[in-house]
């Protein structure tokens, strides 16, 4: 009986309130993570996009901010839609370039959001990520 209860509770451990502002506590996290460094393929592609575009130059290697803001903090309140708008259009008045012309960003922005949301939620560790075992 205990095993069934524990296994039923396990999926809940990786869930977050992605749309907490909408008051939806059952909203699933946009990522799947195991052991802090094994993630689903979409989230892994988001991490690869982060690395390829060298976002750490402004936001820090652990997303805690440098000249750009801490994304660990920002993603606690920033909606997915606002994240998309910010990444695509940039915030030139604050020094962030628009990334809308990047094919990689267009293809992987949701994975990038998932990666950063996982970092913000404290579920994804900083550093190198690996794919979940299939």
Walk through the language-model features, giving the residues of each.
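Short cysteine clusters
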Residues: 55-58
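Gly/Gly-Pro-rich "capping" loops immediately C-terminal to redox-active cysteine motifs
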Residues: 37, 43, 47-48, 60-101
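Bacterial Sec-dependent signal peptides at the C-terminal "C-region" and cleavage site
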Residues: 7-19
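Flexible coil segments in periplasmic/lumen-exposed cytochrome c-class electron-transfer proteins
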Residues: 17-44, 52-53, 97-134
